[in-house]
């Protein structure tokens, strides 16, 4: 007969209280008497995902790519918690890469509990880096940003205040809701292989990779490059501005 570990846990923990009987606590190496339900852990991890930021609240115009200015983003993760931020415009596939060097002191000192994240993509660091690279976009080309539920975007409310760009979060385990970004991350692995320290690349080198990707012709764009498609949108905005002032 086979018994799952979950059945053993349920037989030991006091039903309804999620706690061990007192005489069993001393047997635990961690001494942890309470057992937090997985759902509670998920709720804590996703506390930054509020009802108004769900992907279901994102403007419907973002779905068919007819209206430019809707972006998807994520982290490309490498060795030793290194990362590069990737942001892709849904209509033109134009890509921005975010340099995320490790903070000073990473792995060299004890990080205080609830202190700043030093891996390079803590919430405040991520917000600042994203705002720096996206705040220069024209309003018409910065309508929304869709991200997964990673805690690196916990400062999304402040990001919206600083840039005017609302952030929406995809549903759990639904990478297809950010399909453009997922596909782009796959292309980027040609330049940033898995298992490498992504902090070894400088901001200039990362920008060169973004340029290479944005000047690669795409079948989905009628063999235009993302840079050409994005520049067309910029030109349309300029022409509309001239027509309005004229």
Task: Map each language-model feature to its residues.
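Conserved short alpha-helical interface segments
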Residues: 1-42
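Active-site beta-loop-alpha junctions of metal-dependent nucleic acid enzymes
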Residues: 77-81, 97-139
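Acidic/histidine-rich, metal-coordinating catalytic segments
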Residues: 121, 129-130, 136-155, 172-173
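C-terminal domain-tail junction helix/linker
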Residues: 194-246
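Mobile genetic element proteins and their domesticated derivatives, centered on retroelements
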Residues: 8, 74, 93, 130, ...
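Short, acidic, Ser/Thr-enriched surface-loop or helix-capping motifs
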Residues: 89-90
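RNase H-like two-metal-ion nuclease catalytic core shared by retroviral integrases
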Residues: 147-163, 169-192, 199-211
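Mobile-element integrase/transposase regions
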Residues: 28-84
């Amino acid at each position: 007969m086979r018994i799952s570990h979950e059945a053993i846990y349920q037989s030991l923990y006091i039903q309804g209280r999620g706690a061990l009987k007192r005489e069993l606590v001393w047997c635990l190496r961690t001494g942890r008497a309470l057992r937090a339900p997985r759902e509670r852990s998920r709720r804590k991890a996703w506390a930054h995902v509020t009802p108004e930021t769900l992907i279901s609240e994102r403007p419907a115009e973002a779905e068919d790519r007819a209206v430019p200015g809707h972006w998807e983003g994520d982290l490309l993760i490498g060795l030793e918690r290194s990362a590069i931020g990737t942001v892709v415009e849904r209509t033109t596939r134009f890509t921005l890469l975010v340099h995320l060097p490790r903070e000073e002191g990473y792995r060299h000192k004890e990080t205080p509990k609830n202190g700043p994240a030093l891996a390079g993509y803590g919430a405040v660091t991520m917000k600042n880096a994203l705002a720096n690279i996206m705040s220069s976009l024209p309003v018409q080309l910065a309508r929304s940003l869709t991200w997964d539920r990673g805690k690196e975007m916990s400062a999304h409310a402040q990001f919206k205040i600083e840039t005017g760009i609302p952030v929406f979060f995809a549903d759990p385990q639904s990478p297809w809701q950010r399909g453009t970004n997922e596909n782009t991350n796959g292309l980027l692995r040609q330049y940033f292989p898995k298992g490498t320290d992504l902090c070894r690349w400088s901001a200039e080198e990362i920008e060169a990779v973004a340029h290479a990707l944005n000047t690669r012709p795409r079948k989905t764009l009628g063999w235009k490059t993302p840079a050409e498609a994005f520049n067309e949108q910029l030109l349309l905005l300029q022409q509309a501005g001239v027509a309005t002032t004229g």
